[in-house]
């Protein structure tokens, strides 16, 4: 019995961790933003890659399970360290009412600040989590995909992710294929018509030459986020000669995340294709 307890204690850092940490604790930012680690066992670790997972939810809420913790468990089971980020969103009351016309609420750049701090936190605690600080990337779904890609355009070099995975992402903040709910969620009611912010956060317009490798996937039949968002990003990445892989499925819709039930058999292939891509790029970063 004591031997079993001893073995469990030894392996505690490498089991499926659900001990959430507040990334802003001890800083001047008095917010509670939680990061949930899923650390792969050392014998399974695949090149010691680490992925920060950003669930979608139109910048109003999070699809925390299918696009969050289920993704974390899937990555962990495949030898990849994962941290699920509960970044700040506008929340449901802001979706129902327009109180952010008067009160600031959560809006840009709050989610971006949270992601930047998450990257800094993981790098600063690399030894604690047994991760490689130079191999920390970001994976985002829908609005979380916009957040993930925005890191490549808005963050300083030392905070830049090593790679990005964007799954059915929101990309543009301008017509004709903008996802208006995400735009309102990110910008807030008082700034949703601000042309400068719309331009700044239309990611297809500002791909830097320093952009890290990108894995991009979506479905033509997406009923939520116009599939042309990903097409715009693919074109921009190609024009800038950024290493990337774009996979466009005919069917699958939106919001399937890491689920084995949602989407279609075609769209669920994204996981195996993504793992193959991650195994390829881990030697380059």
Predicted regions located by residue number:
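C-terminal catalytic histidine-bearing segment of alpha/beta-hydrolase fold enzymes
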Residues: 33-38, 93-100, 231-285
């Amino acid at each position: 019995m004591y031997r079993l307890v001893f073995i469990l204690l030894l392996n505690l850092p490498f089991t499926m961790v659900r001990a959430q940490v507040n990334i802003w604790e001890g800083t001047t930012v008095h917010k509670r933003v939680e990061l949930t680690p899923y650390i792969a066992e050392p014998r399974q670790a695949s090149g010691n890659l680490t992925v920060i997972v950003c669930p979608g939810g139109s910048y109003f809420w999070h699809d925390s399970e299918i696009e969050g913790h289920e993704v974390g468990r899937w990555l962990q089971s495949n030898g990849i360290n994962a941290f699920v980020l509960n970044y700040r969103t506008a929340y449901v009351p802001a979706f129902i009412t327009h109180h952010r016309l008067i009160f600031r609420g959560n809006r840009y750049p709050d989610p971006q600040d949270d992601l930047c701090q998450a990257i800094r936190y993981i790098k600063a605690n690399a030894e604690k989590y047994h991760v490689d600080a130079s191999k920390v990337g970001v994976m985002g779904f829908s609005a979380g995909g916009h957040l993930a890609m925005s890191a490549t355009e808005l963050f300083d070099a030392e905070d830049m992710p090593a790679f990005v995975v964007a799954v059915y992402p929101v990309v543009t903040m301008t017509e004709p294929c903008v996802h208006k709910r995400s735009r309102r969620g990110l910008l807030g009611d008082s700034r949703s018509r601000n042309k400068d912010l719309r331009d700044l956060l239309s990611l297809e317009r500002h791909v830097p030459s320093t952009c890290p490798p990108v894995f991009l996937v979506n479905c033509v039949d997406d009923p939520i986020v116009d599939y042309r968002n990903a097409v715009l990003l693919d074109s921009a990445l190609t024009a800038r000669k950024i290493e990337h892989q774009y996979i466009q499925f005919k069917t699958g819709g939106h919001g399937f995340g890491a689920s084995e039930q949602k989407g279609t058999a075609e769209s669920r292939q994204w996981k195996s294709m993504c793992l193959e891509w991650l195994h390829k790029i881990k030697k380059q970063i």
